[in-house]
Structures are given as C-alpha cells and as structure tokens.
C-alpha cells in the first residue's frame, strides 16, 4: 500500500472515531464471544484512539453478544453499534462507510484449503483448476467470498458459522464437503483449535483473488 493512501486512510478513521467529542464509548461488533477473537483489530482501534486523545477519552466496548456479519451491518445501521470489520464488497460499501485501510493487506484474498485427509490422493500437485472446481467447498453464508468463488466457477455451499468456524471444520471432517478455503494468516491458528477433528491443510494449491478487509461505520452515525 502506498504511504499517501495509508496516511489518508488513517486520518479518515481518526476523524470518524473522534468526531463526537462527547462520546465516551465506542461499540464494536464481533462474530465470536471468545476473548481471542479480534485481538488484532481491537488493538488497531486502541492505537487509533490513543493517537487522538485530544478529542477526549473513549472506551472500546464489545457488542453484548456475537452476531453474524449481516446482523453486524444491521446493528450499525440501527445505531446499536459504531464500528465493525469485514471483507468488503459493493453492497457493504453502498450501505456503510468503508475505511479503506486494508487490515490484512492483500493476504485476506490468499486462501488455502482445509480438507479431509482422505482427499490427499485426488488433490496432488498435478491437480488443475478443473479438479478444484469439481469440489464442493464451504464458506460462511453471509461472506462476500461466496459470490467471488461462485462467479469464477467454484461450487460453494453457505453455512451459518459458529464459534471459530466449528461447523465448517466439522463438515470437512465428516466429508459433508470437500474443502474449506481459509485465510492464510488465520488458518494455522484455527487448525490448532480444531486438532480433534479429522482435517488437514492441502499442500499444493492457493486460491488468490482481490479481497480486502476494512473497518466500517454507519453513514448515519459515523463516530
């Protein structure tokens, strides 16, 4: 990311977060209740608030319960929460204000495949895109990735996601689907959490597409 764009994004987020000098709390949404979820994103928000102390002290507060991405968007639009983070798409940028600071840089669009070990023989180094497109994959039912993958000829099922994607890993473990494309940054952490399941990391293929994760705020309540 070029430095001028980075600085501009940081300044915009500073302005939005500090716009209401009387604000005492900033409510962020979350997908999981686990304390480990969103550590990086919350740390970024803390750093930004620490850099704008001249606007007053603001406390970060999690939304009372974990909710799906579609419900997170709704909570911002209703004024029940102030900020969320998510992979972007056109619909989200039309409804909310995106802060175009790529939180994971380009790596949000680098996906490796979590598979059942029984799939290793068919997913060899020589397997081509036709082989990959013959697989049934799984993603969160409200993730923008579904649209990207299906538009490019992949077969994808949507699943209501649960704590640390347990339902997706269980589907792979039970051979209900063939693969779960996962972010390269997060996959090893998640595999460690699901080491009790019969899953492994496919070694030879990488799905790569433009995919950026941003903070979002409501256009009606940009604080």
Predicted regions and their residues:
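Ligand-binding "clamshell"
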Residues: 24, 91-103, 190-205, 209-218
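Extracytoplasmic small-molecule ligand-binding "clamshell" domains
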Residues: 23-97
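Bilobed "Venus flytrap"/periplasmic-binding protein-like clamshell domains
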Residues: 34-48, 113-156
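Short beta-strand-to-loop elements that line the ligand-binding cleft
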Residues: 57-68, 138-139, 156-168
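A ligand-binding cleft/hinge motif common to bilobed small-molecule-binding domains
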Residues: 75-77, 83-96, 178-199
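Bacterial N-terminal signal peptides
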Residues: 7-15
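Short helices/loops that flank or line small-molecule/ion binding pockets
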Residues: 65-81, 152, 166-186
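A bilobed periplasmic-binding-protein/Venus flytrap-type ligand-binding module shared by bacterial periplasmic
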Residues: 111-127, 210-223
């Amino acid at each position: 990311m070029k430095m001028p764009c980075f600085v501009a994004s940081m300044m915009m987020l500073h302005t939005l977060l500090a716009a209401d000098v009387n604000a005492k709390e900033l409510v962020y949404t979350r997908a999981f209740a686990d304390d480990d979820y969103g550590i990086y994103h919350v740390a970024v928000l803390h750093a930004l608030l620490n850099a704008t102390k001249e606007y007053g002290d603001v406390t970060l507060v999690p939304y009372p319960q974990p909710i799906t991405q579609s419900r997170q968007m709704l909570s911002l639009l209703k004024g029940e929460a102030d900020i969320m983070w998510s992979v972007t798409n056109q619909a989200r940028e039309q409804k909310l204000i995106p802060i175009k600071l790529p939180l994971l840089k380009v790596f949000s669009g680098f996906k490796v495949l979590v598979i059942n070990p029984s799939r290793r023989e068919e997913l060899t180094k020589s397997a081509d895109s036709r082989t990959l497109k013959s697989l049934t994959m799984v993603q969160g039912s409200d993730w923008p990735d579904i649209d990207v993958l299906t538009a490019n000829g992949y077969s994808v099922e949507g699943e209501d996601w649960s704590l640390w994607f347990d339902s997706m890993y269980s589907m792979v473990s039970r051979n209900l689907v063939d693969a779960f494309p996962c972010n390269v940054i997060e996959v090893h952490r998640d595999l460690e959490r699901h080491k009790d399941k019969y899953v492994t990391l496919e070694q030879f293929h990488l799905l790569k597409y433009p995919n950026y994760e941003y903070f979002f705020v409501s256009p009606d309540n940009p604080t």
